[in-house]
Amino acid sequence: MGQLYMQRFENWGAVSKGDFDQTWGVALQTFAKSGNWGGVEKGVRHIKTYGTSWGGYALIEVDDPAAFAHYQAHHYQNYGHVARVTFEPVSDMDAMFAATVEQLRSKSTR
């Protein structure tokens, strides 16, 4: 398994509807072609996109740093004028703490 990233896209407030719609058109074409928002054929796997009132998140898995660099560059070149885009590495804390939680549960039931 590669590194998980939570990608955040926050819409800029002063963007015209035309620019916003045109950019989403590019984004949807990119996704339809490659299966992800960054247009890479392999090395970045799209898991899920979540929308919010201000933009949203996309959860991705990265296996190839060069592909991730291309993925990021695509965002900055094509979407940066309508949204602030950031990428945060995330980890599965449920899995990380599972053994400790299980030990605590077993102690509390004695």
PLM features: residue spans?
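Short, charged/polar low-complexity linear motifs in solvent-exposed/disordered segments
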Residues: 24, 75, 86-88
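Short amphipathic alpha-helices in soluble, non-transmembrane regions
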Residues: 69-77
